[in-house]
Amino acid sequence: MCSEHPLAVKWQSKIIAMVSLNKRCTFQVGENPADERTLTLSSASNGGYYISLRPFVEPKGSESELPYEWAFAGSPKSLEAKKVDELRDDINFNFDFDTNVHLNAENTHRGVVETHWKKWESGLVEERGQVFPFGPDKQAVSFFELWQPIDATRDEFVHISEKSVDQSAARSVVLALDDDNYRGLVITVGKWTQGILFKKAEHTAKGINFLRACESADGKITTLLKYGVDFDRFPSTFVGQKDAELQGAAGAFWKVVESNL
């Protein structure tokens, strides 16, 4: 399986080893005009852990408090997929991490999100689905997203092509934290790292933390997104052997739950 979809998925209960990094190009909700106000990246590990961070490029008004359209993440157990044909796939998500749910935001979909994917001739990938923000028995809201698969082994946005490095050989490391007060997930694919950290008892913007970083050709790590009052609880290094523990601030220990190093 090549990197054609924004998330590594479980095909008929079998995990297909791959990493993926994808940049969203377009977003449309209902009958509203298509637009893109964020720099959204979705990444997934060989084993199917996934994360999507969606920061606004130019936050407006109250968006400045939490300048993200949305963010979510999950383990392989939180998604299921079925291959329809060579170009189309169905993926059902039940996120482990969802900023809207954590914030107890009004008009928030809860539970499984059913999505439908189709690869275009250009290599872009279409995603369509429906959510039920007003309740499962209320009016559905349709959405459309368009994704560009990115070469995770490069430190810049280079789209996947026949000349790209085999993405299944790219670095794939996942860190997880779950203690009395916090839970989080950090996923590194190739040169790109994204992380999410929730404070369990804090259901405001103060309980949410995000990380995005990229490693350059000389090995230097550049932090691209840094958000949250507990950001320093993220580890200072993002890679390690399976079952190793990496430390953040204030005694936060992150366990390596997946690694191909």
Curated annotation (Swiss-Prot):
Keyword Cytoplasm, does the record have it?
Answer: yes
InterPro entries membership: Hri1 (IPR031818), Hri1_N (IPR038744), Hri1_N_sf (IPR043047)
Q: What is its main location?
A: cytoplasm
Q: Might you report a single GO cellular component term?
A: cytoplasm
Q: Please state where this protein is localized.
A: Cytoplasm; Nucleus
Task: Alphabetically list the UniProt keywords.
Answer: Cytoplasm, Nucleus
What Gene3D superfamilies does the record point to?
Answer: Protein HRI1, C-terminal domain, Protein HRI1, N-terminal domain
The record's family statement is: Belongs to the HRI1 family.
Q: What is the protein name given in its UniProt record?
A: Protein HRI1
Q: Which gene encodes it?
A: HRI1
